[in-house]
């Protein structure tokens, strides 16, 4: 004989199951999507001269350059937020952090400025992505506008485990050490090529193209900002497709200084000299090796 539960009990059970199912399907609070924006000036639209445009409070057109950079930064923040970012931290990364102002920055962004900061840019595992705005290519890159690797006066070349890198490559690797992918860059044609060699799927806003190191073609500022907004939003919408660039095992950072840079470099114990102008900084990982180099 099959015993049947009372109708009232059965109805209550069904209702409980329905409520449990409904509650289980309620969306949980989304994990914050925090983006770190690295900014520079040499890759900004309309900028082709260091002396005329890029030296803080010395260049006659520096204030104009600040406005161009700020416009690109704010366009990128707009795009990131539209694409799903919940927090954007903007690092004022050009020439000792003297280019951006809290008066002008996007109201929904936070600004990291001043010195000193960590050589790893205060990055940590709380970030979901890194982007570059106004970025230039590495020293020696072909037809790259105002190209250099950290210091045009002091550094000739940098290698990480024998891979030639500039600021783009080094920071892609440092971000990867924290499990954070780089998803987007704005800059000139050469900078876009550089990021895509490391992160082929990265979105790139090509705002200008060089015909030499100090000349080239540029988009008008409104067009550059519109492109940056579009590319940053697209990168954010595609975030799930990106993985961090991870350098495994022991790491050697090899730095070839310019003659001027070599003359002022003071080696310390544990750093290997390769030749008159080249030194190797070793570590168990990219962070340890980079911190050794950056401590000089």
Predicted regions and their residues:
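Alpha/propeptide regions of enzymes that mature by internal proteolysis
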Residues: 56, 60-91, 97-100, 108, ...
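Bacterial N-terminal signal peptides
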Residues: 12-22
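Bacterial N-terminal signal peptides that target proteins for export
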Residues: 2-13
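C-terminal accessory domains and tails appended to enzymatic cores
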Residues: 88, 224-296
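Active-site rim beta-loop-alpha module in soluble metabolic enzymes
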Residues: 174-182, 186-231
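A glycine-rich helix N-cap at a beta->alpha junction
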Residues: 107-123
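Active-site glycine-rich loop that binds ribose-phosphate moieties when present
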Residues: 152-178, 187-190
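Boundary of Sec targeting at the N-terminus
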Residues: 28-30
């Amino acid at each position: 004989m099959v015993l049947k539960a009372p109708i009232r009990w059965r109805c209550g059970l069904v209702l409980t199951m329905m409520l449990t199912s409904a509650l289980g399907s309620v969306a949980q609070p989304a994990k914050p999507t925090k983006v770190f924006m690295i900014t520079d000036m040499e890759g900004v639209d309309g900028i082709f001269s260091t002396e005329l445009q890029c030296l803080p409070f010395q260049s006659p057109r520096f204030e104009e350059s600040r406005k161009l950079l700020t416009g690109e930064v704010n366009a990128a923040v707009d795009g990131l937020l539209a694409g799903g970012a919940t927090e954007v931290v903007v690092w004022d990364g050009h020439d000792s952090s003297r280019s951006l102002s809290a008066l002008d920055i996007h109201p929904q962004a936070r600004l990291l400025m001043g010195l000193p900061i960590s050589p790893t840019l205060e990055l940590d595992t709380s970030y979901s992505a890194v982007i570059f705005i106004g970025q230039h290519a590495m020293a020696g890159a072909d037809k790259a506008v105002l190209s250099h690797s950290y210091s045009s006066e002091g550094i000739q070349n940098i290698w990480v485990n024998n891979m030639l890198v500039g600021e783009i490559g080094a920071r892609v690797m440092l971000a990867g050490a924290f499990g954070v992918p780089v998803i987007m860059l704005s800059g000139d044609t050469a900078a876009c090529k550089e990021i895509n060699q490391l992160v082929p799927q990265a979105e790139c806003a090509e705002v200008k193209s060089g015909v030499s190191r100090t000349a080239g073609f540029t988009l008008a500022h409104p067009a550059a900002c519109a492109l940056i907004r579009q590319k940053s939003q697209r990168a954010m919408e595609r975030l799930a497709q990106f993985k961090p660039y991870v350098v495994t095992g022991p790491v050697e950072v090899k730095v070839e200084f310019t003659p001027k840079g070599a003359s002022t470099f003071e080696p310390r114990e544990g750093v290997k000299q390769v030749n008159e102008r080249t030194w190797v900084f070793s570590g168990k990982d990219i962070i340890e090796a980079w911190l050794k180099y950056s401590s000089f």
